[in-house]
Amino acid sequence: MSPLEQFRVTKLLDIPALWGIDLSFTNCSLVMVLASVSSILLLCWALRKINVVPGPSQTAVELIYGFVANTLESNAGAEGLRYIPLVMTTFLFVLACNLVGILPFGFTATSHLSVTLALSLVVCTAITVIGFRHQGLHFLRIFLPEGTPLWLAPMMVFIKLFAYVARPVSLAIRLAANMIAGHTIIAVIADFVLKMHLVLAPLPFAFIMGLIAFEIFVAILQAYIFTVLTTVYLSDAVAGH
């Protein structure tokens, strides 16, 4: 079987198209729903009883909250803390989707550019709205840094505008590419192990376990990077330059 077969999107529930848009419920849709629901349920379970001396589950949630709050404050200042719900939701969703894909028979929704691009566009659109809300039309100053010579202004505006539009694209490609690469390598080596003689199998099998552990690290790292970049972009909207 092709190592790319694991990324195939299959229809689970066929829904008639609306205005030419396929609304069918797929395995990708199912994973995103499961990732969202599982994140909510785990948070509710971890915080079902808040103690002064936190237990392991409460400590884990507090660590995630602390990471989001500290990252926001360091990049966007105290004003950025009001957007903790946006950033924390983004982090948990990306992390859950990444980790679900590592489970046996799992499907990695974040390996598809359509998913990561949609998520990136939602985040960047929200940041743009926040920017205009905080700064009004002064938000447009991010495209023309103060002190730019007049003769250089048109080129600077073009470069800054291109970089701004490229933000969601770079976020999406980075996340999808890393998820595809890791899962493909694991699939190739796993197929190699299955076709090997039993005596030789333990070594590559141990290597696969190491790769899976590394893939878990990558899944967490990519959610971390996505979140940090979101807070960096949010700093332009909240505080400007």
From Swiss-Prot:
Biological function: Key component of the proton channel; it plays a direct role in the translocation of protons across the membrane.
GO molecular function: proton-transporting ATP synthase activity, rotational mechanism
Disulfide bridge partners, by residue number: none
Organism annotation: Anaplasma marginale (strain St. Maries)
One Pfam family this sequence matches: ATP-synt_A
Name of the molecule in the record: ATP synthase subunit a
PROSITE patterns in UniProt: ATPASE_A
Entry GO CC: plasma membrane; proton-transporting ATP synthase complex
Keywords carried by this UniProt record: ATP synthesis, Cell inner membrane, Cell membrane, CF(0), Hydrogen ion transport, Ion transport, Membrane, Transmembrane, Transmembrane helix, Transport
Subcellular location: Cell inner membrane
Family named by the database record: Belongs to the ATPase A chain family.
